[in-house]
């Protein structure tokens, strides 16, 4: 018979060696003090490659819960594409090969920066180099950023692009993201981007660097640079291939629709036949080939528990409800069989330092009731450490930690009485670094470690690991088989 287990996610509570501005270290936390003395615990990595993000990038709640719930490292699109290029696998991508085979001309359209939010310049240039080596004529349609990076950094990125130019690679157009990456159906903006990219209208005799300087002289920063085509580019032709290289979808849907959809009617467009592909899936209704399809992890923790015929309870307040349901279940909206979800409303305040307790008490009560109702598995998220950490208010963050500590105490006490194993960890840190060394307020997540405590019969040691090890550890505690797709248990 399966044993019962609880996973407590203390959102935004992590480890830092710094003490002065550490809300966790300075809070009243008798439950944690006992855990440190009496309970096996270890460190967990929550950022960078350990959760499928670029090296050094801080973790976030979405990837943290996906990693915990799936029991494996799910590489984010940016990393997946970067690895494909660095390991020389991109050139063999089936959809890419088919796109190259359709035309001698390839247009690459995307955001020219290293912001890593929508695109990466290394992807842009890496793909251009591969296509050029295959003998294709490559036209670059550079969208200037100025939002995820400095507002006047375009020339820095242009200098990187220019190192790759040659007989087969040319800059065709430049346009600010305000135009070519609109997402609010402001079609008059998109039209300007479209006309430069597809029709080569309007045109300038200036080179790209001179054109950017001229834009700055008119007080147009990178985001707002007017779309323009350069001498030597005469627009797209019938049967040209087009690859949209942004991996984030929301700001590429409109320009992709305008370029690729034959029944598009929001403005007048050219009647030419193009072969369009997208690097990731932008919209379920698009029929374009996709180079990197979304992974839907099979055999997640929730799925395995449901398949075993066991009952599970997922609960959090509003701020983290999607994380313990949709993200924890690997991007699945619908609950599994025998999965109950309980949403507790977050308090209606402007910022959570006004009420650092948030709705933790009510969330805790759902867990206690869940034990009374003999759920086999309970996952709960306490949002306080993260949401109050984001306000930058150290005193409020100490109250947030104390509140979570109090709820942990009640859960651990009852779990002992009801024979539940308990695993306590965090998706990422935040409140342990409220200011930097100079006393400046920090509101961001940290890129450090978090703790993993395991209160369970027969467990005397917990290995260090990552969030990908949490699901297999829960299954081990429950006496259920760990599926082959998952990584190893920490106990």
Swiss-Prot record:
Pathway(s) where this gene product acts: Carbohydrate degradation; glycolysis; pyruvate from D-glyceraldehyde 3-phosphate: step 3/5
Enzyme class at the top of the EC tree: isomerase
Catalytic residues identified in the record: 61
Gene Ontology cellular component terms for the protein in this record: cytosol
Residue numbers binding substrate: 118, 147-148, 177, 183, 248-251, 320
Binding note for cofactor: Binds 2 manganese ions per subunit.
Residues that, per the record, bind Mn(2+) 2: 11, 61, 427-428
Catalytic activity, EC: 5.4.2.12
Record-listed Mn(2+) 1 binding positions: 386, 390, 445
Catalysed conversion reaction: (2R)-2-phosphoglycerate = (2R)-3-phosphoglycerate
Pfam families: iPGM_N, Metalloenzyme
Cofactor: Mn(2+)
Domain of life of the organism encoding this protein: Bacteria
Example of a GO MF term: phosphoglycerate mutase activity
Record-linked InterPro entries: Alkaline_phosphatase_core_sf, BPG-indep_PGM_N, Metalloenzyme, PGAM_B_sf, Pgm_bpd_ind
Database matches in CDD domains: iPGM (cd16010)
GO BP field: glucose catabolic process; glycolytic process
Sorted UniProt keywords: Glycolysis, Isomerase, Manganese, Metal-binding
SUBUNIT field: Monomer.
Entry function: Catalyzes the interconversion of 2-phosphoglycerate and 3-phosphoglycerate.
Family label: Belongs to the BPG-independent phosphoglycerate mutase family.
Matches recorded under HAMAP family: GpmI (MF_01038)
Protein name: 2,3-bisphosphoglycerate-independent phosphoglycerate mutase
Origin species: Sulfurimonas denitrificans (strain ATCC 33889 / DSM 1251) (Thiomicrospira denitrificans (strain ATCC 33889 / DSM 1251))
């Amino acid at each position: 018979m399966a044993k019962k287990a609880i996973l407590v996610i203390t959102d935004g509570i992590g480890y830092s060696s710094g003490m002065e501005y550490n809300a966790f270290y300075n809070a009243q936390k008798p439950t944690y003090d006992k855990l440190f003395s009496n309970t096996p615990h270890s460190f967990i990595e929550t950022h960078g490659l350990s959760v499928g993000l670029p090296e050094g990038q801080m973790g976030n709640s979405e990837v943290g819960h996906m990693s915990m719930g799936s029991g494996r490292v799910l590489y984010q699109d940016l990393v997946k594409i970067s690895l494909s290029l660095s390991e020389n696998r991109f050139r063999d991508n089936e959809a890419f090969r088919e796109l190259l085979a359709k035309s001698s001309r390839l247009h690459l359209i995307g955001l020219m920066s290293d912001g890593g939010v929508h695109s990466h310049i290394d992807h842009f240039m890496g793909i251009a180099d591969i296509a050029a080596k295959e003998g294709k004529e490559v036209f670059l349609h550079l969208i200037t950023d100025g939002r995820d990076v400095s507002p006047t950094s375009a020339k820095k990125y242009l200098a990187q692009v220019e190192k790759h130019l040659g007989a087969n690679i040319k800059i065709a157009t430049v346009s600010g993201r305000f135009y070519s990456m609109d997402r609010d159906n402001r079609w008059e903006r998109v039209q300007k981007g479209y006309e430069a990219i597809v029709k080569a209208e309007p045109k300038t005799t200036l080179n790209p660097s001179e054109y950017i300087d001229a834009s700055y002289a008119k007080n147009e920063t990178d985001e707002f640079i007017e779309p323009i085509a350069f001498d030597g580019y005469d627009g797209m032709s019938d049967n040209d291939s087009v690859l949209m290289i942004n991996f984030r979808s929301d700001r590429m849907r409109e320009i992709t629709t305008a370029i690729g959809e034959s029944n598009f009617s929001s403005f007048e467009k050219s009647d030419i036949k193009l072969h369009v592909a997208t690097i990731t899936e932008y919209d379920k209704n698009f029929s374009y080939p996709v180079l990197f399809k979304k992974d839907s992890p099979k055999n997640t923790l929730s799925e395995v528990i449901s398949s075993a015929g066991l009952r599970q309870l997922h609960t959090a307040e509003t701020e983290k409800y999607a994380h313990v349901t949709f993200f924890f279940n690997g991007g699945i909206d619908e609950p599994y069989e025998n999965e109950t979800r309980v949403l507790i409303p977050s308090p209606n305040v402007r910022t959570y330092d006004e009420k650092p307790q948030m709705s933790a008490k009510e969330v805790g009560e759902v867990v206690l009731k869940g034990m009374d109702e003999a759920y086999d598995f309970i996952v709960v998220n306490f949002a306080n450490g993260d949401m109050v950490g984001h306000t930058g208010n150290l005193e409020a963050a100490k109250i947030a930690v104390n509140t979570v500590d109090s709820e942990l105490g009640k859960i651990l006490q009852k779990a002992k009485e009801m024979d539940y194993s308990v695993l306590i960890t965090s998706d990422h840190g935040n409140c342990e670094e409220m200011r930097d060394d100079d006393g400046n307020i920090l509101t961001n997540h940290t890129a450090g470690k978090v703790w993993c405590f395991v209160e369970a019969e027969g467990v005397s040691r917990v290995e260090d690991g990552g969030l990908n090890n949490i699901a297999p550890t829960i299954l081990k505690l429950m006496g259920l088989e760990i599926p082959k797709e998952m990584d190893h248990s920490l106990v």
